[in-house]
Amino acid sequence: MGSEMCIRDRNVNIGNRKKLINGNGFVFGVPGSGKSFFCKMEMGSVFLSGDDEIIVIDPMNEYFDIAQTYGGTVVNMSTYTDNYVNPLEMDVWSLDPNDSKGMIREKGEFMLGLCEQCIGDSLNSRQKSIIDRCVRKMYIDIARGREKYIPVMSDFYDILMEQPEDEAKDIALSLELFVNGSLNIFNHQTNVDVDNRFTVYGIRDLGTELSPITMLVMMESIQNRIVENGKRGKATWLYIDEF
């Protein structure tokens, strides 16, 4: 009886997942069954029915069209586009030398993960101490200075080169490809509107070398956005295609 009703009832049954104890969901189906179409339909409904924000991690760049339709932001992550996300971006105008808000500490922890990906191996205790020292110096100097600026990876690289330890030079050498080399897409100021209500991160064109670092930077940016939205009482819908 129940299966017969499901076959004959071709109406779209829409529920508000935000009212559930756990509103997470999965979309399953064989290729060509309409999974992406269903997600796009739900995204449109969410976007038009309130002020919730939508973020999409798009491994095949197939959600660019709907983002552009709704005036959203498309961030095409690759070495040959001019879309940049600065991993060191922070509200430097809210910094204080004592790091009372923990902003520098959180960025230091993120940079440990980023440097580990660039080096390609686990960090030892000396490397961790050097990286943390350089991150703290970079942001504390900005906090104490009269003119505020958002640092980029080359600023961090320069501070590493100033350190007396040989390990600091080794870390800087591992970062060189991603700072001054051909994979330097993260050595730029952010030039895309990641605060848009509808943001799609396209990752189809990433190479194997850049993919792990890009995922780390992208997830850091997304996490910061979700936390900020939570403080404002705004819901965030995160879609991860081809999970």
Locations of regions flagged by a protein language model:
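P-loop NTPase motor domains
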Residues: M1-E4, R8-R10, N61-T73, T79-T81, ...
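Glycine-rich phosphate-binding loop of nucleotide-binding enzymes
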Residues: E4-M77
